[in-house]
């Protein structure tokens, strides 16, 4: 019985491979019929065949480019609806077509960050692995975006927020936020996150100085009042009050 089962399995595998081979051959014959190319022999026939197949390749390339764009647009639609998981899937697919597009990685970072918030421990196992994995995906996506475009302000800011408020790795946030502020010196929110990072790492003077910068430059009354309150907290910590 064992030999019969093995023989039957081998026959099934052979049939599958033959079927795949037949399918590929059928596709090839269809392509040849569509292009009017069968078995070129002369120089002119080879040139004509190459030209026809190059056009087919160009058409496929154009279609792939459009598919990537549509995935990106669909992802943005899902973001508008706050459907972060669906959006994340779309941006991951878009990256398959545009692997060097920093914006796609940025949005993966954003979506993964939101997905981390919804990754609840529904089985009550006490595990935070799923949440942590989403946060690490967000980190790697932001880092990839910055690797492609090192002056990408939104990715620098997103990474800073992630390190300070989600991963509790404020020391890692500081260089990225400082870089951001050399690019956009008036980025008040980045100053606030950097001040927070300084405070969490024990550099209270630097934290107070950053809050002071916000106080001097912002026109937003609420942000100014918050910076004044936080500056006092930082100075009190610096002088042990």
Segments (PLM) and residue ranges:
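Terminal, low-structured helical/coil segments at or just beyond the last alpha-helical repeat
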Residues: 189-192, 196-241
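Helix-start (N-cap) detector for alpha-helical repeat units in TPR-like alpha-solenoids
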Residues: 68, 102-103, 153-154, 188-189, ...
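Residue-level recognition of tetratricopeptide repeat
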Residues: 76, 110, 117, 161-162, ...
């Amino acid at each position: 019985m064992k030999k019969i089962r093995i023989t039957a399995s081998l026959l099934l595998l052979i049939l599958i491979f033959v079927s795949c081979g037949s399918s590929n051959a059928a596709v090839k014959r269809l392509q040849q019929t569509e292009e009017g190319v069968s078995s070129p022999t002369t120089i002119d026939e080879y040139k004509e065949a190459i030209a026809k197949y190059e056009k087919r390749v160009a058409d496929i390339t154009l279609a792939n480019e459009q598919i990537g764009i549509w995935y990106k647009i669909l992802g943005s639609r899902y973001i508008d609806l706050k459907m972060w998981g669906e959006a994340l899937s779309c941006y991951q697919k878009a990256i398959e077509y545009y692997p060097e597009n920093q914006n796609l990685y940025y949005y993966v970072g954003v979506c993964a960050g939101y997905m981390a918030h919804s990754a609840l421990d529904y089985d009550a196992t006490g595990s935070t692995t799923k949440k942590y994995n989403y946060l690490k995906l967000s980190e790697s996506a932001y880092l990839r975006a910055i690797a492609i475009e090192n002056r990408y302000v939104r990715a620098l800011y997103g990474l800073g927020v992630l390190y300070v408020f989600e991963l509790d790795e404020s020391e890692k946030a500081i260089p990225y936020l400082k870089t951001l502020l050399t690019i956009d010196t008036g980025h008040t929110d980045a100053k606030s996150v950097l001040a927070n990072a300084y405070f969490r790492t024990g550099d209270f003077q630097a934290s107070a100085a950053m809050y002071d910068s916000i106080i001097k430059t912002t026109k937003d009354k609420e942000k100014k009042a918050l910076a004044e309150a936080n500056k006092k907290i930082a100075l009190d910590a610096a002088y042990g009050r």
